[in-house]
């Protein structure tokens, strides 16, 4: 739990952010930024793990080839960059018994090795921090990212679809801590 992040954010460890990728289509407006990301390589955040050429060939970015790849990319390429602050993700806790157990959060890259959410968001996930396993998914198309943001964002799902009461609220230790 992390009471210092927004209800719409999920704290993602840098180690995980380097494995999860977001496809970025290269165009004349972002080519400079994507070249810098490629030159960072796959081991430094923010970096990139792969590029996809317009003919569909996928190339892994390594320390040995990152300069060549940065020179090669042009409009039409896709760079599979690391997850960065503000990217849309979908957080899930099994079992998914209702739609509220999968909601969209914005990534916030943080140190340490655990996923973090605000305490007020634990109710829909039925999370109690006793070793719960949470799954983080990254939508891979612009359409999926927009759909997740519009339909699944925590801020758009504060009321329960079942009985209309707020499900983003203080509960258990949160209330006790506020009293103390």
Residue ranges and their predicted role:
Residues 1-158:
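Core mixed alpha/beta domains of very large multi-subunit molecular machines
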Residues 157-168:
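Flexible helix-coil linker/hinge segments at domain or subdomain boundaries
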